[in-house]
């Protein structure tokens, strides 16, 4: 069983989603199925089929969450330090072409969310950053072409 690296915050968030799906969503969906079933003929009952589809989706996500939580390798970022970039680091970069600054935290695949400034450890940018230090320059082959970034800060938060 392959371990899935994740932060303690990511583990907690997945646990909360699992709890909600099991204790709130599952009973609500079962109620919808029972209500739709009471309307008679199931072969032409759109409400019933929609509720069954929702149940299938929810149960699939529950199984996925249980699997990820069971395989979690929780990494406590508060205990990490140093100036070398690794899993959990929050890195400030400056694009060498545009001088635009960006801040990214390197997290597990299940936690990655670009809108929240979190990139997967398996992403091209994270792979280029791992092992580097403040002051280094990294080149990343992005969909829009090669980009160069200077690492201006490495933090652990």
Swiss-Prot record:
Biased composition (Basic and acidic residues): 16-60
Keyword tags: Coiled coil, DNA-binding, Transcription, Transcription regulation
The keyword DNA-binding is annotated on this UniProt entry: yes
Single GO MF annotation: RNA polymerase binding
Region: Disordered, residue numbers: 1-60
GO biological process: DNA-templated transcription elongation; regulation of DNA-templated transcription elongation
Classification of source organism: Bacteria, Pseudomonadati, Pseudomonadota, Alphaproteobacteria, Hyphomicrobiales
Function: Necessary for efficient RNA polymerase transcription elongation past template-encoded arresting sites. The arresting sites in DNA have the property of trapping a certain fraction of elongating RNA polymerases that pass through, resulting in locked ternary complexes. Cleavage of the nascent transcript by cleavage factors such as GreA or GreB allows the resumption of elongation from the new 3'terminus. GreA releases sequences of 2 to 3 nucleotides.
Designated name of the protein: Transcription elongation factor GreA
Coiled coil regions in record: 46-73
Domain of life: Bacteria
Family that this chain belongs to: Belongs to the GreA/GreB family.
InterPro entries tied to this protein: GreA/GreB_C_sf (IPR036953), TF_GreA/GreB_CS (IPR018151), Tscrpt_elong_fac_GreA (IPR006359), Tscrpt_elong_fac_GreA/B (IPR028624), Tscrpt_elong_fac_GreA/B_C (IPR001437), Tscrpt_elong_fac_GreA/B_fam (IPR023459), Tscrpt_elong_fac_GreA/B_N (IPR022691), Tscrpt_elong_fac_GreA/B_N_sf (IPR036805)
Keyword set includes Transcription: yes
